[in-house]
Amino acid sequence: MHWLTAGLMLLVFALAFSIDLAPSRASHLAFLQLHRSVGVTVWVLTMARLVWRSLAEYPNWPSDMPQTMRVAAVASEYALYALLLAQPILGLLQTSARGDHVDLFFIGQLPALIEQNRPLARQLLTAHTAVGFSLLGLIALHVSAALFHHFWRRDDTLTAMLPAAARLRPLSSRAEHPCEADESPSRAEC
């Protein structure tokens, strides 16, 4: 679910930045409705992830990982979940306050959450935008931390996040194979 969320967030941000660049009013509205639909999907997926998270065992930390890094990892995870839940709700509230609606993937309308209120809609758009940029920053921090663990600390943090079929051997174990060590056996033995 991690990578599905990541892919959907990439799509949501691409749509958000494309809406105002749309060549026509029709494509503008189509991008906007798709952005809203994918945002609702992210919210549902995040709720499912939280349920899964509450039932699943927490992943093992690298044994040499300092307590401060563990606290930072948990805090950033909770912050990501909070923003992933808040962002679509703010978007839905803003849409309702504008007097607009969400056509969920063009197959059905979601009900308005609040009555039309244009001044509130502007404030909600500001909040939605601020949370969006906060999410981008937190996602950048998340990716940077994963790369730091993989390339600097050489632990299994990044590989543990990969889908099972795509898992690579961690950097720390790459030289452990006899054929890759400095004193490698003859090619026939490999």
Predicted feature residues:
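Membrane-embedded alpha-helical bundles that constitute the cytochrome b-like, heme-associated redox core
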Residues: 1-190
